[in-house]
């Protein structure tokens, strides 16, 4: 139950990275590291500690696939997304899921590369979370889809978004809300997360950018936003009930997150855009800050953290309305939740 700081450290390019996850205690002492198993390397998109003291992490792996059925080559190099659950104490892989075993390549929105030898990042897994029933929520930027996955079998229980042939929900907008286009809520999205009672939140990038796709891939909706969706499993309806637009009207080609605070506010990290913001439930912008030029953050969180006294605890304190920037993760206890009452910028 002790509070910990977690982060990923490694190398990589274009969102595909290889490295190690670290766990430090409140005295800033290393207490554990987590590595991927089965010959893979941990990617920096996610490191989630579960109530069972296991870690949910992501990895990427390459394979060769026959894509002739979708107009591609017979020997295309592809990049598949992998989820692993790791026993933190032993390093053992307890469970593994590979996107290619469950999702057809035809579901990708990512253009095929010019050469079969150029890896096609068709899925781009970027988040894994726990739903309230203990099953997993997996997000894939390049299929414009979020998946609920059975934690034991790996089967997809339902999917939200993506191509109509496999989307399990009728997508509508509440009064005053605007869809990306008919039947589409998000594009190139990140950070699919359950808020309980059928409420789910996303960071809706609406752009992948030339650097990610090789083409101008800006989607129909003209700016990035944080969105909230209500799922009705009985009627198979997904309703866009709330959205917070990027204050400067910009689109983030990569990264980003949305966090619901205990007070009901929404903290948004704008990813590759050098901003982070906090909104009241009624949409009022409470806080908007900008990093120096050339700096961006994968995610930004408002989290309590009580630093140790002495040299290790230096750093300016701020009022709780100021989000706590963390390079991918933050001050959390071993269940992935915050547990202190002191707020800082890091």
Predicted regions and their residues:
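Ser/Thr/Gly/Pro-rich low-complexity, disordered linker/stalk segments of secreted
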Residues: 311-346
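Histidine-/acidic-rich catalytic cores in large beta-rich domains
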Residues: 1-312
């Amino acid at each position: 139950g002790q509070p910990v700081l977690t982060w990923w450290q490694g190398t990589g390019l274009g969102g595909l990275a290889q490295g190690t996850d670290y766990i430090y205690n409140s005295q800033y002492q290393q207490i554990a590291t987590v590595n991927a198993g089965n010959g893979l390397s941990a990617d920096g998109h996610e490191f989630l500690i579960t109530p069972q003291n296991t870690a949910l992490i992501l990895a990427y792996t390459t394979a060769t696939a026959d894509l002739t059925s979708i107009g591609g080559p017979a020997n295309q190099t592809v990049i598949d997304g992998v989820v692993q659950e790791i026993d933190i104490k032993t390093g053992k892989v307890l469970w593994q899921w590979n996107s290619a075993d469950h999702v057809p390549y035809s579901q990708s929105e990512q253009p095929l590369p010019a050469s079969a030898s150029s890896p096609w990042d068709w899925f781009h897994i970027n988040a894994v979370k726990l739903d309230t029933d203990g099953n997993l929520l997996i997000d894939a930027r390049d299929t414009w889809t979020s998946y609920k996955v059975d934690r034991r079998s790996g089967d997809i229980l339902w999917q939200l978004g993506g191509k109509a042939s496999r989307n399990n929900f009728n997508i509508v907008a509440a009064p005053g809300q605007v869809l990306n286009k008919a039947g589409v809520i998000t594009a190139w999205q990140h950070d699919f997360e359950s808020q309980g009672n059928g409420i789910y939140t996303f960071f809706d990038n609406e752009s992948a950018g030339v650097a990610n796709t090789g083409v101008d891939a800006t989607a129909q909706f003209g700016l990035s936003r944080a969105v909230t969706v209500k799922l009705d499993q009985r009627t198979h309806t997904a309703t866009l009930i709330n959205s917070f637009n990027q204050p400067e009207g910009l689109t983030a080609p990569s990264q980003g997150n949305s966090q619901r605070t205990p007070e009901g506010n929404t903290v948004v990290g704008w990813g590759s855009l050098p901003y982070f913001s906090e909104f009241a439930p009624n949409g009022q912008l409470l806080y908007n800050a900008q990093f120096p030029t050339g700096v961006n953050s994968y995610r930004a969180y408002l989290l309590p953290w009580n630093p140790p006294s002495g040299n290790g605890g230096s750093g300016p304190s701020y009022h709780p309305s100021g989000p706590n920037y963390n390079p991918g993760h933050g001050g959390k206890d071993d269940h992935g939740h915050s547990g202190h009452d002191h707020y800082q910028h890091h």
